[in-house]
Curated annotation (Swiss-Prot):
Protein name: U3-ctenitoxin-Asp1a
Superkingdom field: Eukaryota
Location within or outside the cell: Secreted
Family annotation (Gene3D superfamilies): Lipase, subunit A
Protein source organism: Ancylometes sp. (South American fishing spider)
GO molecular function: toxin activity
Amino acid sequence: ANACTKQADCAEDECCLDNLFFKRPYCEMRYGAGKRCAAASVYKEDKDLY
């Protein structure tokens, strides 16, 4: 898995997950086509802009 700091760092079919078991967020494949990433486990791009 690739490390990420925001959702934009990942591919369109991946989510940027911040998991307590890992030292840093990483890109994880989405579960099912078209499903959105859980907001709580994703770095929100709008907050990264500031």
